[in-house]
């Protein structure tokens, strides 16, 4: 039992350490962590040709509160990085778009993150990287399942 407890503590510490490094080291110059997440979701959606996202959908994806999403979107909008567009089919729905002018700034910051990910992949090698990716997805599914059970 003590061995399992130590393993759990080590995993938690490793997770916290990675999270702190990602959030606390100011890797990005032009965006906060949450802003780059929002822009990343908007960019992926635009590139894939899927319909744009709403603020509610962004909140669902990021697990941020509606007030946090609105604060982030207002900031991005005031900097001219996004625009909001009311649906022609349902006036209650407002879509969020990444502006073309914001693309170079976003992609530049995205490249910085990819450089870090590339360093991880180079250090781990292809097989370990694939295994890490699979394990991260599996762990995310477990966390989502635990949270879903708590919400019931």
Please describe what each predicted stretch is.
Residues 74-130:
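Charged, amphipathic alpha-helical coiled-coil/dimerization segments
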């Amino acid at each position: 039992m003590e061995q399992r407890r130590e393993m759990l503590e080590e995993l938690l510490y490793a997770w916290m350490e990675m999270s702190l490094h990602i959030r606390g080291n100011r890797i990005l110059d032009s965006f906060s962590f949450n802003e780059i997440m929002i822009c990343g979701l908007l960019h992926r959606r635009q590139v894939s040709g899927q319909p744009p996202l709403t603020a509610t959908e962004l909140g669902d994806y990021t697990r941020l509160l509606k007030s946090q999403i609105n604060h982030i979107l207002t900031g991005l909008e005031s900097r001219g990085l996004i625009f909001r567009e009311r649906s022609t089919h349902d006036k209650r729905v407002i879509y969020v778009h990444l502006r073309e002018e914001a693309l170079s700034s976003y992609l530049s910051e995205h490249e910085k993150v990819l450089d870090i990910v590339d360093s991880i992949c180079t250090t781990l090698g292809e097989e370990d990287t694939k295994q890490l990716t699979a394990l991260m997805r599996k762990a995310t599914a477990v966390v989502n399942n635990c949270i879903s059970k708590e919400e019931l």
